[in-house]
Amino acid sequence: MTDIMELIFDELNRRWVYKYETYAPLYVCSAMMHSFNLMNQKRQIYWEGSRLPNMRMHLLFVAPPGFMKTHYLSTMGGDRFAIFKNAGVHVGHEQSLTEAGFIGTIRNVSGVDIIVEGAAQTYANGLMLIDEFSAITSALKVQYNAQMDTQLLAALDHGNVFKRLGGGKIAYQTHLTLWAGVQPARYDLSSGMGRRLGFLLFLPTKYDNDQLRYHMHKARGVRPDENVMNKIWGLLEKNIKNMDIVETVTYGESVYQKYGDMELFSYESSYFDKLLLGWHLMTYGPEKHIVIEAGDELLDKLIGSQKKWRNEIVSGVDYVQVMKLIKVGGIQVAEGFEITLPDLVTQGIMVGWNAHQIHEKIMEMSRQRMVSMKGSVITLLTSSTSVNL
């Protein structure tokens, strides 16, 4: 681990940020790829099949209401003493944003058509942080794919935005990198939108809730350390400026082998290419000739968790959340894990579910033979207990 990552980890640990080892590296990888992409669009040193790729690594934090989505955005980019706030990257932070607010629109004011600039244009070369991005949530849902907004996809993919409205047209290019939060739902990651996003998944258990409350308690009274932050910002800014020294990027055969071992879908490999390059830049800094190889223990852990989260999101995070609540809140029996319905309802309130929603989810899982129910006792069957906590 480089000095910069040790400094960031030490600072997040000092701030009592929960699970920083799990989530913070992805934000740093994304920021490194944002800077690499800006450099590559200008210097054009890395190509794929005679095509200049867009190497941005957008991130969506998927978690129930109240469980760290906004906290991580504020800690990594939004607050005055955030990790990337003064690191040479333009950062914008919005509480919520619609598709029109993100892309832009045209409004008629007293008979005059006026173009209203969207966040994707305002922060065309920056990081855009959005606590709750409803347009992304809609575009990723399975039932929405047929009518997915092509301009939202364009802004996050190649960056060439063109939107024709009754009052005229909007056209611009954006290199914005998106960090946003969304609530758990069943998302289609094979869609155009899903293939271009990285995911951070947090499905809390009672243990997580207790630990998070403890971390919040310990964080009270912790003041910013301006000397440490100035050092972190300086090192990050130096890394960003040094992107211009990169001349070649090569992916070794071990990467191809690793993707095979992980059974990646072909449409996932592009995102994982960015993750590996971001990791390399985060760990070693920019180099003249970058050669990326798989096999680093920490890297394997990072990409393993990313693949696991993607699989869980596709299979249904509501099911995974119920499994985790049963495993942590119940008791182990021969058939699997057992919990009473009242106890599960109590656990479900923590993540924003009411008794009716819990009962519906249990009925769905029972039909799929993931759980069995006798009276008020629910058993998570052994065949369904492979979910990691």
Where are the regions a protein language model picked out?
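Conserved ASCE P-loop NTPase core motifs with emphasis on AAA+ ATPases
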Residues: 1-13
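Short, conserved micro-motifs enriched in small and acidic residues
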Residues: 17-26, 263-271
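Exposed regions on extracellular, virion, or secretory-pathway luminal proteins
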Residues: 1, 95, 125-126, 329-334
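Terminal-proximal interaction/regulatory segments of ATP-powered molecular machines
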Residues: 315-389
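Short acidic alpha-helix initiation/capping motifs at coil-to-helix transition points
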Residues: 2-5, 270-271, 336-339
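Phosphate-sensing "switch" segment of ASCE/P-loop ATPases
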Residues: 163-324, 328-329
